Amino acid sequence: MLEREVRANLVYRSFTRIGGGKVPDDTVINKWALALGPEVIEDLHKRVVTIAQDKQIVEGRKMRIDTTVVETNIHYPTDSSLLGDGVRVLTRAMKRIVAIAGNVGAKLRDRSRSVKYRILEIGRAARSQGGAGKEKLQQAYRKLLEATSRVVGQAKRFSLEIASGVKKSSDVFQQAAMEGLRKELDTMAPRVQQVMQQTRARVLGGDTHVDGKLASIFEPGTEIIRKGKASKPTEFGKMVKIQEAENQMIISYEVYEKRPSDSALLVPAIETHQEQLGRVPKLVAADAGFYSASNEKTAQEKGVKRVCIPSRNTKSADRKKEQKKPWFRKGQKWRTGCEGRISVVKRRHGLNRCRDKGDRGMRRWVGLGVIADNLINIGRVLARKDKATAPIVA
């Protein structure tokens, strides 16, 4: 898409310094993006914010903050589908090993078809109601777990035989490919075993709270996050903080390895604001999830004059009166714009779902989306200023 846009647009050609030259292929552009680490993207973002401050687009008098979930690129996780994924990946790797090394050592038995039938059987049993349906479901899961266990055991034997030299190739490049496949088996087999463990606990033991629960064998860092949304009660991805100043400029973003409490993010956000813009904001606005008495006190001690964060459970008449004052309501009205900004970056810049892989890919994806949105907002503000200062022609 980027290649097509740049190729047909003279403004984009000038901006990217391509001019009349050949536009790089989309695969080359993707490789360039992947070569940039998330640390480089963060430095670029800080530079963009500094430019916005130099051009007086952002002053740092106000700050608003919110969190959202950026989903990883996975299908909806069910125990049976995750087990099916594991069998498919392990079997595919073992088939490639056999194609390289031949039929030496442990023989490959392809259980993909039987696993597929078990998954279909689970789907039919899950639609049945009553005790008989539950018993059928458990029986189908037992068969699926047994087949998956045999595939995992086979994958471990293949890995050991490659390491010991039983399965090998005289070709250097083929041997290197086989070593890569062994690493894939060593990575995926423990993940599949973890899925087997959580499946046994949930389906056979009734325990839905298993430590280290996997939502994907391809994106093991995916968190299961429930934010209470009616439209999407459960999301699978990473929690991301979006922090803004004036003119919808995102001055800070952060992807969290583990979901933190919103209230734990407020004070560090004020410190980040001060570090980035060189001043403490006069007004801080956030939703009720960021409120705590200690947060409000610390913010005021740091120099924030107006903390516009409502208290959910207050019974104090003075506090209720404070939250009805015009300045507080105005601050909360401005705060709702953060939700709109998050909606825009999700729709316009792809932050609804990360297409990159891994935690570093998530940080890179979010950072590039934030930079793109900031550049658009900088351009709009500068265009508005130029229009305001342009001489009126009679």
Where do the language-model regions lie?
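DNA-recognition alpha helix
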Residues: 2-15
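Anion-binding and metal-coordination hotspots
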Residues: 6, 21-23, 29-394
